[in-house]
Amino acid sequence: RYGADVINRIIEQGKPGGVKRLQDAILKETLRPMVGLMCKTAGITADRIFRVAIASNTTMNHLLLGVDANPVRMEPYIPTFFQWRGLVAKDLSFAANPDAEVLISPNIGSYVGGDITAGALTSLIWDKDEFSLFIDLGTNGELVFGNRDFMMSCACSAGPAFEGGDISCGMRATDGAVEAVVIDKDTMEPTLSIVGDAGQKPVGICGSGIIDVIAELYRTSIISAKGQFVREGKRVAHDEHGMGRYILATKDESETGREISITEVDIDSFIRAKAAIFSAINIMLSSLDMDVTVLEHVYVAGGIGSGINMENAVRIGMFPDVDRSLFEYIGNSSLAGAYAMARSDNAVDKVDELASNMTYMELSTNPRYMDEFVAACFLPHTNRELFPSSVQE
């Protein structure tokens, strides 16, 4: 209702009465029913909740607390607050015991918020000697790099494609979502893995499935490095304007009676999203006079599906071409971090410590970022030497 991205929500809260309107949308219209459902499932009443832990992005932290979020999107891109302690449920009319402690995971910068500090907590980057990279895939792609000695963070505007947004048949990773794809190189026929019970027909395609289908289309030479269709077959169709698409499921094969396909426009949107991630990784590492060869762990988080085919993510140039054993998909890390904070004072102290010690890099003011981004808007990249395994294929 108020936009799928934080910028639209900030604009909305800037209108007369907007701050209160969005705060009510979060607390009363969203969280209160969720808490009610959780209490019903657990067989308890809300007054038995004595601690609440929240891990959300910087903008949502501001909107939740009824604080002006405009500084998030305006130069010099400094949030109104970074850390807020001492809250209790009655301060927010939160659906819990009035004296329940409300813990907000702290912000690092305008686009690296409490969801990332909570995620960094669970990744254990801070407890390792080795250099690790933490990547959270969402509308903003957030990165944390470092080890027990230091940590640096940044964010890039990847858009909603990783979560199925701005994709013609995209959806979140719920029942009916195509989450994995393999394409036969000769017949061009797809084999689909679908979220849900056995026999579930496809409804749409989620982030992990989009990664797979683009990687497979490229591997089988159905699309070019620019994401354009260059092979013909019964699974490839074109509209009246000549725009190509690959048909994953015909009307008869889908749950909804609607064709499920991925178009050249979809592919272009996703290429831009993956380019944002890869270029951010390059900029962050190069700012430290390092490159991807120093990486010993790569943790990937986000609601993109039950898992990511890391080989395919590298094939399209989304992640660096390093040993695949370094990658680990850790799922919803911000939720895991909030859970840890709810259960442990030590976790609360640690997440505050991480936030205080983490350096934030603002990519939007980096003069090299756009050049790196444009170079990454190909499959896998304009510099093929960065992807030796793709060259070997």
Task: Give each language-model segment a name.
Residues R1-D5, P71-W84, A118, L124-G209, ...:
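Glycine-rich phosphate-binding loop of actin/hexokinase-like ATP-binding domains
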Residues R1-L63, P71-R73, L103:
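N-terminal glycine/serine-rich phosphate-binding loop of ATP-dependent small-molecule kinases
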Residues G3, R9, L63-A118, F162-D166:
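Glycine-rich phosphate-binding loop and adjoining helix at the ATP-binding site
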Residues E29-A42, I116-G119, I271-T293:
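Phosphate/ATP-binding catalytic cores across multiple sugar-kinase/actin-like superfamilies
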Residues N57-P71, G242, M290-T293, G302-D321, ...:
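Short glycine/threonine-rich loop-to-helix capping motif typified by GTGT followed
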Residues E101-I116, A340-E393:
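Acidic, glycine/GT-rich loop-and beta-edge segments that sit at the periphery of enzyme/chaperone cores
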Residues N147-M152, C156, M290-L354:
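Catalytic phosphate/nucleotide-handling subdomain of diverse soluble enzymes
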Residues Y218-L288:
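A contiguous, well-structured pocket-lining segment that forms one wall/lid of small-molecule binding clefts
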